[in-house]
A protein has these predicted regions:
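Terminal, low-structured helical/coil segments at or just beyond the last alpha-helical repeat
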Residues: 21-27, 143-197
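Structural marker of alpha-solenoid helical repeat scaffolds
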Residues: 29, 63, 97, 131-133, ...
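Residue-level recognition of tetratricopeptide repeat
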Residues: 33, 67, 101, 136-137, ...
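TPR alpha-solenoid repeat register
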Residues: 36, 70, 104, 139-140, ...
Length: 197
């Protein structure tokens, strides 16, 4: 009987290496870089496929966990879907990694405006974003105009609206429409102020 056991042990020992022909699990290697995932995600956004876009932005973060553009893009998707808490999280994370990031700063300000809260922080964020020369400047001024109208700071609102009008390209019809709406609101507010004699 002991001899039978020893033969069984030898056979098992010999067969184990013989299984090396079986396929081994291979770790998935993502062929795309973080910027490539971002580009693909942005193309999905343009096509209206927010779920696919979100998946690509998340994949970019798997490649580079501190990739600021992916946090901003996820914040933009969340803001577009009215998920303000999620948008705030993503923009805050972007600002933790890049404190002067103008897009994240302005968009976080817009989140707070939408929530009707933290108006002092809105102004600070917008002013921070304005310190960087970028094509965003008219949008940041629009953010400030919206804030000042909410605060009934009509002179300040008028000033930033004039600045935004002066630098908004005529081809940017969506922003020009928004600025026109703000000017109309400003005119209404001025008309409610009693004339002083």
């Amino acid at each position: 009987m002991p001899q039978t056991w020893s033969w069984a042990f030898v056979v098992a020992f010999v067969m184990i290496p013989g299984c090396s022909w079986l396929p081994h699990p291979v770790a998935y290697q993502d062929p795309l870089t973080a910027p490539e995932h971002m580009a693909l995600g942005e193309s999905y956004v343009q096509q209206g496929h927010s779920d696919l876009a979100s998946r690509e932005f998340e994949a970019a973060l798997k490649q580079q966990p501190n990739y600021v553009p992916a946090f901003v893009a996820l914040g933009n998707l969340a803001f577009h879907n009215q998920s303000l808490t999620a948008a705030e999280f993503y923009y805050r994370r972007a600002l933790e990694l890049s404190p002067a990031h103008p897009v994240a700063a302005n968009n976080l300000a817009m989140v707070y405006l939408s929530k009707e809260e933290k108006f002092d922080e809105v102004e600070r964020l917008a002013r921070t974003a304005l310190q960087h020369e970028s094509q965003l400047k008219p949008y940041i001024l629009e953010t400030l105009a919206t804030l000042y109208l909410k605060q009934d700071k009509l002179i300040d609102a008028q000033t930033v609206l004039e600045q935004a009008d002066a630098i908004t390209p005529p081809t940017n019809t969506s922003l020009l429409t928004r600025l026109s709406q703000l000017r109309q609101e400003l005119t209404k507010r001025w008309s409610r102020i009693p004339a002083q004699h």
